[in-house]
Amino acid sequence: MYAVIKTGGKQYKVAEGESIFVEKLDVQAGEEVVFDQVILVANGDDVKVGTPLVEGAKVVASVDKQGKEKKVVTFKYKPKKHSHSKYGHRQPYTKVTVKSIEA
């Protein structure tokens, strides 16, 4: 059984027991989070596609950890002018493990 959920402006295909990295959620590690924006639920040959969401479907997951990705470095410069700038960015994420899919 798998489902497609929408969170953080992105869509993720999830299955029970699977761990995924999603955009940062405002919850602590160890807490449960419920994703109720379910776009598709499939159980074998039984596939339910929402218009746009599947009514009554939800995915329950537990938060494993909060973290930041590797740093992305951007360097800009103007040739022949002593002008340059270096920027770094680390995108925050939340690692969740799917406990159950209810449809």
Swiss-Prot record:
- The identity of this protein, by name, is Large ribosomal subunit protein bL21
What PANTHER family does the record point to? Answer: 50S RIBOSOMAL PROTEIN L21, LARGE RIBOSOMAL SUBUNIT PROTEIN BL21M
List, alphabetically, the GO terms of the cellular component aspect.
cytoplasm; ribonucleoprotein complex; ribosome
Give the superkingdom in one word.
Bacteria
Keyword annotations? Ribonucleoprotein, Ribosomal protein, RNA-binding, rRNA-binding
The record's listing under SUPFAM superfamilies reads: L21p-like
Q: How does it assemble?
A: Part of the 50S ribosomal subunit. Contacts protein L20.
Keyword Cytoplasm included in the entry's annotation:
no
Function field: This protein binds to 23S rRNA in the presence of protein L20.
Q: Which Pfam families match?
A: Ribosomal_L21p
Q: Which family does it belong to?
A: Belongs to the bacterial ribosomal protein bL21 family.
Query: Per UniProt, what is one GO molecular function of this protein?
Result: structural constituent of ribosome
* GO BP terms: translation
